[in-house]
Amino acid sequence: MLKYPDYISKLISFLKKLPGIGFKSAEKIAFELLEWDPSQIEAMALALQEFSTSHATCSNCFCLKISQTSPCNFCSESRDSSSLCIVATPKDVFALEKSKIFKGHYFVLGNLLSPITGKHLSLEKLAILKQRIEACSPKEMIIALDATLEGDATALFLKQEFSYLPIKISRLALGMPVGLSFDFVDANTLARAFSGRNCF
């Protein structure tokens, strides 16, 4: 059986690591890149290199830094410190920012509890979250997680973990279809879900 040259096989193997990209899609992308001008490929390689060395997260909220200011833009005093929104990924922060409904602070968990795979939350991040809540005393903690089994399990865990604090704990409701990830929810739907959040 005839095999692809190593440089194509290697590229396909890397592309397959991306979510939603199987062998056929990776193969298609690899052969599309063969048609690109070498300068475009070099520019892409440079962008990937810059991406790997330049991205940074805030040590306070774990959001992606969009500038070198400290605290980060999402932790600045210009935002409403009375509400803290818990999300799973830095991408979720930008999704909520597009909805223009939330002006408070964020905290990025990084991953969700998974009853199926046994995945746990980061103990280090939980400790930082506790310190932040106890130090800043927000009035409301909004759990903005995917409406999935993992999101439900994580939300329940957080509710139990912080039930000793005099803080309102709410979760996004109206407009968030069950089983759907933030990635597939538009800004208007997120805004409605935020407005319709319930005590949890």
Curated annotation (Swiss-Prot):
The keyword Transmembrane helix does not apply. Residues 82-177 form the Toprim domain. GO terms for biological process: DNA recombination; DNA repair. Keywords: DNA damage, DNA recombination, DNA repair, Metal-binding, Zinc, Zinc-finger. InterPro entries: DNA_Rcmb_RecR, Rcmb_RecR, Rcmb_RecR_Znf, TOPRIM_dom, TOPRIM_RecR. It comes from the Bacteria. Gene3D superfamilies: 3.40.1360.10, RecR Domain 1 (1.10.8.420). The keyword DNA damage applies. A zinc finger (C4-type) spans 58-75. One of its GO terms (molecular function) is DNA binding. Belongs to the RecR family. PANTHER family: RECOMBINATION PROTEIN RECR (PTHR30446:SF0). May play a role in DNA repair. It seems to be involved in an RecBC-independent recombinational process of DNA repair. It may act with RecF and RecO. This is Recombination protein RecR. It comes from Chlamydia trachomatis serovar L2 (strain ATCC VR-902B / DSM 19102 / 434/Bu). The gene is recR.
